[in-house]
C-alpha cells in the first residue's frame, strides 16, 4: 500500500510497506534529480549525509531505488527509502494543539541530542 504523506521542494514522500523487512517505510521520490546540476549536487549531498546517520533522533537512509521503468538513458528520478515516522516537527509546530513547556523542552532536548 502506498499513500502520499507529504511533498516538498524536491519531490513527494509516500508511505509504503517493505514486505521483505515487514516494516513501514517512507519513500522520497525526487523527479528529474539530475536535470539541474545544482539540484543534483544537493540531492547527492543529502544521500551521502543520510547514509552516515546512525542516531535515534535522526532519520537515516535505508535504501535507494532505481526508477520503476527500465529506461536507463532517461534516468532522472531518485527514490530514497527511510524509516517512516509517525509525524514530524513541522506538523507538530503548526498543529492546532497547544504545546506545553514540557513538550517544548522535550523537543529541544531531542534536537540537541541529534546535533
Predicted segments with their positions:
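Nucleotide phosphate-binding site architecture
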Residues: 6, 59, 90
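Conserved N-lobe motifs of Hanks-type protein kinase catalytic domains
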Residues: 7-8, 22, 53-56
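Glycine-rich ATP phosphate-binding loop
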Residues: 12-33
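Conserved beta-strand core positions
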Residues: 25, 59, 78-80
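Conserved HxN/HPN-centered segment at the entrance to the catalytic loop
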Residues: 54-65
Amino acid at each position: 500500500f502506498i499513500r502520499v504523506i507529504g511533498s516538498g521542494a524536491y519531490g513527494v514522500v509516500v508511505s509504503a510497506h517493505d514486505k521483505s523487512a515487514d516494516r513501514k517505510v517512507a519513500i522520497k521520490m525526487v523527479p528529474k534529480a539530475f536535470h539541474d546540476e545544482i539540484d543534483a549536487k544537493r540531492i547527492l549531498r543529502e544521500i551521502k549525509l543520510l547514509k552516515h546517520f546512525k542516531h535515534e533522533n535522526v532519520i537515516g537512509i535505508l535504501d535507494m531505488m532505481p526508477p520503476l521503468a527500465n529506461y536507463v538513458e532517461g534516468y532522472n528520478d531518485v527514490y530514497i527509502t527511510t524509516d517512516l515516522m509517525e509525524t514530524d516537527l513541522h506538523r507538530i509546530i503548526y498543529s492546532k494543539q497547544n504545546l506545553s513547556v514540557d513538550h517544548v523542552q522535550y523537543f529541544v532536548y531531542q534536537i540537541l541530542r541529534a546535533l
